[in-house]
Curated annotation (Swiss-Prot):
Interacts specifically with GTP-bound RND2 and CDC42. Interacts with PDE6G and microtubules. Homodimerizes, the dimers can polymerize end-to-end to form filamentous structures. Interacts with AKAP9, ARHGAP17, DAAM1, DIAPH1, DIAPH2, DNM1, DNM2, DNM3, FASLG/FASL, SNX2 and WASL/N-WASP. May interact with TNKS. This is Formin-binding protein 1. May act as a link between RND2 signaling and regulation of the actin cytoskeleton. Required to coordinate membrane tubulation with reorganization of the actin cytoskeleton during the late stage of clathrin-mediated endocytosis. Binds to lipids such as phosphatidylinositol 4,5-bisphosphate and phosphatidylserine and promotes membrane invagination and the formation of tubules. Also enhances actin polymerization via the recruitment of WASL/N-WASP, which in turn activates the Arp2/3 complex. Actin polymerization may promote the fission of membrane tubules to form endocytic vesicles. SUPFAM superfamilies: BAR/IMD domain-like, SH3-domain. Residues 535-617 are annotated as: Interaction with DNM1 and DNM3. InterPro entries: AH/BAR_dom_sf, F_BAR, FCH_dom, FNBP1_F-BAR, HR1_rho-bd, SH3-like_dom_sf, SH3_domain. It comes from Homo sapiens. Residues 495-617 are annotated as: Interaction with PDE6G. Residues 280-315, 333-366, 486-531 are annotated as: Disordered. Changing T165A: Abolishes membrane invagination. The F-BAR domain binds the phospholipid membrane with its concave surface. The end-to-end polymerization of dimers of these domains provides a curved surface that fits best membranes with around 600 A diameter, and may drive tubulation. Belongs to the FNBP1 family.
Length: 617
């Protein structure tokens, strides 16, 4: 089966077919190229996906990824990154082993095809030229024969005519002979050209064309084989990465099998364990008995002297409920009056209604009375320190000793801080050793440097080490203090704590026992000696650095108000004061007389003029 013998007359169709074969090969190259682009795009998307879900450094997410399930997820992301790398390998191998190779082969194929069809067209043109020569000699031979016949007939006619001279007859005879000779020459030439054409035609159809078509056939078959080999390479490139992709998938399975739910549960305990003991039983409060209270100075003095107030606010049973009390609620209990404001006096006389028909002095809420008694004892200092620490936490300030955290979390933070400081100390010590060695080298070889130039740096490093050690001792002391307070402390510590509780009146040590402030922050627990040594000035100093609330306007007292309840302030008719808090709907306005004296007055007793800028802000 040969194109040279079977398709000897299909030159044009073979030319079209071979061009179609090259187009198919180029189309396959384009297909592989688009596949490589898809692989690269897919790999890029996988990498971006893996990067997107990676935990951010120095963020809360990084702390959350300590759980085994999250670690498995990280392993999944890493394996996905490697998986994406294999798709990049597929793209690279296809580009180098298929696209580049086939593109070069297509150029060679086009050149070979062009050469073969050029030879075919050249042979075709040659046979066409021979055919034209044959046709030309044939027409000339035919013309000469006709001319010879006419000359012979003319001679015979002249020879038969008796009226024609002998000279004319001779001339006609010579002309006939010339034409006859020309016909013979044309015949010989035609015969020669015909033989030559037949030979060329035989060579063309039986030698040249078969050889050229055979080359074209071989070229086309090589193209087909090359395309098949490229398809095999295409599959092999994919097959080569399958084992590595399998390892990636095995890694994902292994990471999934490493998930330990029990370990994660333990980590949750370590992350959120507060170290507090569950609250005790709430004592029964009998409201059937009349509550005898007095707010006179004598009763308050007696309460402080005896250390036995009527009610135990913040005792052990209620102290455990501190974590569930909102800070703003506590502040309102401490500062805002708990009675509705009195109506304005019926007459313009300031003495007409001194305190109003519903003055807070006449009736008190039990909770307000408890706070009144609570505020007259020294433990208020610690409670307000706890409150201040909670407020500072809400404002974003974190105490250095992490006292805003529950005991267990505070212990972990302190331990972490101690470890960090120890690492810094070790780093500074290594630096000091390096400087010392360099100084020794300078001492032995003065030409290398001046030893005295390192003294300043050595002193600076030593000073840093000393500072870090002092800092470490401070945090270690806090850590030891916290570890001594955790529920798992020794029996001796428990006995000492019980002795301490029994030696202090309930009202005095209530706030000291409660280690959690109203916002859930952890506060310091003072010993008995420090409790007895605290002076009233300590409480004032504790809040000296608190900035007063800014004034939002002014007010003028319309009537005289004698504020005799906690949180209120006395005003005189016509007095001008600063407004620091508007009426929140309870009928009271918070005002300030100077930097140290402020409180609430009934809104109906004053004429308020708010500053426009402050109101807008």
């Amino acid at each position: 089966m040969s194109w040279g013998t079977e398709l000897w007359d299909q030159f044009d169709n073979l030319e079209k077919h071979t061009q179609w074969g090259i187009d198919i090969l180029e189309k396959y190259i384009k297909f592989v190229k688009e596949r490589t682009e898809i692989e690269l795009s897919y790999a890029k998307q996988l990498r971006n996906l893996s990067k997107k879900y990676q935990p951010k450094k120095n963020s809360k997410e990084e702390e959350e990824y300590k759980y085994t399930s999250c670690k498995a997820f990280i392993s999944n992301l890493n394996e996905m990154n490697d998986y994406a790398g294999q798709h990049e390998v597929i793209s690279e191998n296809m580009a180098s082993q298929i696209i580049v190779d086939l593109a070069r082969y297509v150029q060679e194929l086009k050149q070979e095809r062009k050469s073969n069809f050029h030879d075919g067209r050249k042979a075709q043109q040659h046979i066409e030229t021979c055919w034209k020569q044959l046709e030309s000699s044939k027409r000339r031979f035919e013309r000469d024969c006709k001319e010879a016949d006419r000359a012979q007939q003319y001679f015979e006619k002249m020879d038969a005519d008796i009226n024609v001279t002998k000279a004319d007859v001779e001339k006609a005879r010579q002309q006939a002979q010339i034409r006859h000779q020309m016909a013979e020459d044309s015949k010989a030439d035609y015969s020669s050209i015909l033989q030559k054409f037949n030979h060329e035609q035989h060579e063309y159809y039986h030698t040249h064309i078969p050889n050229i078509f055979q080359k074209i056939q071989e070229m086309e078959e090589r193209r087909i084989v090359r395309m098949g080999e490229s398809m095999k390479t295409y599959a092999e490139v994919d097959r080569q990465v399958i084992p590595i992709i399998g390892k990636c998938l095995d890694g994902i399975v292994k990471a999934a099998e490493s998930i330990d739910q029990k370990n994660d549960s333990q980590l949750v305990i370590e992350a959120y364990k507060s170290g507090f003991e569950p609250p005790g039983d709430i004592e029964f409060e009998d409201y059937t008995q009349p509550m005898k209270r007095t707010v006179s100075d004598n009763s308050l003095s007696n309460s402080r002297g005896e250390g036995k107030p009527d009610l135990k606010f913040g005792g052990k049973s209620k102290g455990k409920l501190w974590p569930f009390i909102k800070k703003n609620k506590l502040m309102s209990l401490l500062t805002s009056p708990h009675q509705p404001p009195p109506p304005p006096p019926a007459s313009a006389s300031p003495s007409a209604v001194p305190n109003g028909p519903q003055s807070p002095k006449q009736q008190k809420e039990p909770l307000s009375h408890r706070f009144n008694e609570f505020m007259t004892s020294k433990p208020k200092i610690h409670c307000f320190r706890s409150l201040k620490r909670g407020l500072s936490l809400k404002l974003g300030a974190t105490p250095e000793d992490f006292s805003n955290l529950p005991p267990e979390q505070r212990r972990k933070k302190l331990q972490q801080k101690v470890d960090e400081l120890n690492k810094e100390i070790q780093k500074e010590m290594d630096q000091r050793d390096a400087i010392t060695k360099m100084k020794d080298v300078y001492l032995k070889n003065p030409q290398m440097g001046d030893p005295a130039s390192l003294d300043h740096k050595l002193a600076e490093v030593s000073q840093n080490i000393e500072k870090l050690r002092v800092e470490t001792q401070k945090f270690e002391a806090w850590l030891a203090e916290v570890e001594g307070r955790l529920p798992a402390r020794s029996e001796q510590a428990r006995r000492q704590s019980g002795l301490y509780d029994s030696q202090n009146p309930p009202t005095v040590n209530n706030c000291a026992q409660d280690r959690e402030s109203p916002d859930g922050s952890y506060t310091e627990e003072q010993s008995q000696e420090s409790e007895m040594k605290v002076l009233a000035t300590d409480f004032d100093d504790e809040f000296d650095d608190e900035e007063p609330l800014p004034a939002i306007g002014t007010c003028k007292a319309l009537y005289t108000f004698e504020g005799q309840n906690e949180g209120t302030i006395s005003v005189v008719e016509g007095e001008t004061l600063y407004v620091i808090e508007e009426d929140k709907g309870d009928g009271w306005t918070r005002i300030r007389r100077n930097e140290d004296e402020e409180g609430y007055v009934p809104t109906s007793y004053v004429e308020v003029c708010l500053d426009k800028n402050a109101k807008d802000s």
